[in-house]
UniProtKB/Swiss-Prot annotation:
InterPro entries: Elong-fact-P_C (IPR015365), NA-bd_OB-fold (IPR012340), Rib_uL2_dom2 (IPR014722), Transl_elong_fac_P/YeiP (IPR020599), Transl_elong_KOW-like (IPR013185), Transl_elong_p-like_YeiP (IPR011897), Transl_elong_P/YeiP_cen (IPR001059), Transl_elong_P/YeiP_CS (IPR013852). It comes from the Bacteria. Belongs to the elongation factor P family. It comes from Marinomonas sp. (strain MWYL1). This is Elongation factor P-like protein. Gene3D superfamilies: 2.30.30.30, Nucleic acid-binding proteins (2.40.50.140). GO terms for molecular function: translation elongation factor activity. GO terms for cellular component: cytoplasm. GO terms for biological process: peptide biosynthetic process.
């Protein structure tokens, strides 16, 4: 059983005899309080989708839920439903946009390393690799000699996400994006 301080986003936990997916974690250190940090977790019930905000001490032990991860690839979207195909047995897994709205900003048909998380055979969330490769579809023109400066500019990616990139990046370039930090991580290898 991990401590509250070891829990990460998109982890499935058991709490009050229910299974929740942790979607957001805020760490705070109360002033004048001997002891550790507090972790406020925003969780969603995997069955009902209801939101629960709960605060844990850093030393609180938390039960992890039984879950299965399957390697998948993005197949298609149908309205607010996004369908992912299992890489081994081609089982389709359908997820609602509200369950994966942050992650879907970094997913297209070419994204590799996606995992769907199943709780009781039901898909509840997707997990992305640390870095994904996406194409810049719109940004200000690159400036000659800009690699010497460290200024950034906004760039719209092929998935619709907007991140800050160095000035030497231009429209049409393929770049690596750190999904967790939503930051430019370098040029993609050709």
């Amino acid at each position: 059983m991990p401590k509250a301080s070891e829990i990460k986003k998109n982890i499935a936990i058991s709490y009050d005899n229910k299974t929740y997916i942790v979607k957001d974690i805020e760490r705070s250190v109360p002033q004048g309080r001997a002891g550790g940090s507090l972790y406020r977790m925003r969780m969603y019930d995997v069955v009902t989708g209801r939101k629960l905000d709960e605060t844990f001490k850093d030393s609180d032990m938390i039960d992890l839920a039984d879950l299965v991860r399957r390697q998948v690839m993005f197949s298609y979207s149908d309205g607010d439903e996004f369908v992912f195909m299992d890489n081994e047995d081609y089982t389709p897994y359908s997820l609602n946009k509200s369950a994966i709205e942050e992650e879907i900003l970094f997913v297209n048909e070419e994204t590799v390393g996606i995992q769907v998380v199943l709780v009781n055979e039901v898909p509840v969330v997707i997990e992305l690799p640390t870095n994904v490769e996406l194409e810049v579809i719109e940004t200000d023109p690159s400036i000659k000699g800009a690699s010497a400066t460290s200024r950034n500019k906004p760039a719209k990616l092929s998935t619709g996400a907007v991140i800050q990139v160095p000035e030497h990046i231009s429209t049409g370039d393929r770049i690596k994006v750190n999904v967790e930090e939503r930051k430019f991580a370098g040029r993609a290898e050709k």
